């Protein structure tokens, strides 16, 4: 027979009383009423907040967007094949956040910050809210540093500054993404962190862009955020905010960052799809009433911070796709009014062989002029006007039989300027090369060169400077000014290259 020892029992009871944990966990739980098309209607969740993360039974996450009297409308961030009517949903008390930090560079992630490049987990513990308030007035300063794109026509006529929002707008297949990729490639060695956000694009296109960046050594300082065409609308809607959050981390550390949103038309369409399925009232072009706020709160996060805040910057290059060149549609006009200027790409110019196909007449940079380097500002001041006048004269001259000599001369120079500004893809030019090319055209030093040989002349001029005048390039890149001595050297080089070229023609 087992003997009972009272002292042993009392010590066990005392121990259990001591170890007793009285904490109570309260969770806000609801039930799925209806599920379909990436939208869930949930009963319960009385304490849920707008924009709060929800967790479904199968681990799928969602965001509460519609808070109604008797149900909550949520969008699902995943396939949600395991979510059924009657399954439980739990509110997390958190807002969506993404991992950020140095380890993100060189990686391809989805809008939740999860790696999709097959290189394993990203070793970072830092996170940042996807939706953050834009910096206030006191935290900012005016744009004053150049963000060189490496594309002569942009840096000379439509300059972009660090902290600016410059829209790239045009029809499909006019080279919008090409300009953005060239700008990323041109940041090599400039200590700029780049974020490329691909929204609703084909996976093959994104893979091609990643490969181009890798080949040119640009992936090392770039983060690619991809929400493909096959992803749920909620992820396409979130992708730009994820890109902004990743860039903000570096901006608040005092670094310069560049974010490409390719493209915001697809994000607006994803948001329209979500809103209509949530039964929000449609407005113009069936977009919801707050579609302006969708883009304004995103693009306002781009800024040049004050010195007290570390002096970092986020430059945004949003891309918008137009239909048949119609910039007066709803989304294009919204984004044009939010940004600090636009680069308009024309399908007609593209098809005529002018690449990049920039329509100088309606492209503008509202704040970039203050950031333009003195060297290019000094010589490119009249370039935009000359090209705009050339376009007008070219249209007029089709109907005029005899033109006066001054008009003919202007037309001939315009043709040569057009040829000088042609630039192949993935070949950005440095400041010194741009200065040399623009100077030759604007000063009329190549008026005798046949139009068909202008591109060849520009290539030979750049090669000559690299081989024989390396000190000229170094001086321009260092001082960013074109003084009288450098100007005399440049004029001498241009005439020398021109003479040797005309002798062989």
Swiss-Prot record:
Pfam families: ATP-synt_ab, ATP-synt_ab_C, ATP-synt_ab_N. The keyword Ion transport applies. CDD domains: ATP-synt_F1_alpha_C (cd18113), ATP-synt_F1_alpha_N (cd18116), F1-ATPase_alpha_CD (cd01132). It is a peripheral membrane protein. Keywords: ATP synthesis, ATP-binding, CF(1), Hydrogen ion transport, Ion transport, Membrane, Nucleotide-binding, Thylakoid, Translocase, Transport. InterPro entries: ATP_synth_asu-like_sf, ATP_synth_asu_C, ATP_synth_asu_C_sf, ATP_synth_F1_a_nt-bd_dom, ATP_synth_F1_asu, ATPase_a/bsu_AS, ATPase_F1/V1/A1_a/bsu_N, ATPase_F1/V1/A1_a/bsu_N_sf. ATP binds at residues 170-177. F-type ATPases have 2 components, CF(1) - the catalytic core - and CF(0) - the membrane proton channel. CF(1) has five subunits: alpha(3), beta(3), gamma(1), delta(1), epsilon(1). CF(0) has four main subunits: a(1), b(1), b'(1) and c(9-12). Belongs to the ATPase alpha/beta chains family. This is ATP synthase subunit alpha. It comes from Prochlorococcus marinus (strain MIT 9301).
